[in-house]
Regions:
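SDR active-site lid
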Residues: 92-152
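Conserved NAD(P)H cofactor-binding loop of Rossmann-fold oxidoreductase domains
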Residues: 9-14
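Residue(s) in the substrate-gating loop at a strand-loop-helix junction
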Residues: 59
């Protein structure tokens, strides 16, 4: 077989402090978001040829540690880092790797993630249309971009975490 495009979009998250979440939930996030993505990518790579594409769904959570979303954000940081490294490794074979890093998207994700049953207001305000997110990610992949960030607010967030120290941003976002 000749695989021209693979999309790794499986993943889940659980919101809550580490000690409040079940260990199985946390290790499950690592298994699905990191191990499964790596395994699928590794299994398909031998069947990919020149001008093939790999689109890995990370998250804007990959850009900054997230209290109460710690394991999820860490797994998505893994996806982003792995995708960037893989893009360099596969460059000589002309296989292009893109990490899609959307913010909150209107899917059933938060039905599973939000353990309190309430989606925070700021997340509801910036929720993106899933079709638009996918369309942008596919377009960015076809253009050979290594990172796809959807929407102006997430692009600003992406720039802020590059400019300001993470501890400063975290203190603003999560001050109690």
């Amino acid at each position: 077989p000749d695989v021209k495009f693979i999309i790794n979009g499986a993943g889940f998250g659980k919101i809550g402090e580490t000690e409040a979440l079940a260990m199985e939930e946390e290790t499950g996030m690592v298994d699905v978001n990191c191990r499964a993505l790596t395994a699928v990518t590794r299994l398909v790579l031998p069947y990919m040829s020149e001008n093939s594409r790999i689109l890995q769904f990370a998250s804007a959570a990959a850009f900054l540690p997230q209290p109460r979303f710690a394991v999820y954000a860490a797994t998505k940081s893994f996806v982003l880092s792995y995708s960037r490294a893989l893009a360099m490794e596969l460059k000589s074979r002309q296989i292009y790797v893109t990490a899609a890093c959307p913010g909150p998207v209107k899917t059933e994700f938060f039905d599973i993630a939000e353990t309190t049953g309430e989606i925070p207001l700021y997340k509801r305000l910036v929720m993106a249309n899933p079709k638009k997110v996918v369309k942008k990610a596919l377009r960015d992949s076809m253009m050979g971009k290594r990172v796809s960030v959807y929407g102006p607010l997430m692009k600003v967030f992406f720039l802020l975490v590059k400019v300001f120290p993470h501890d400063f941003i975290l203190s603003l976002l999560f001050s109690a």
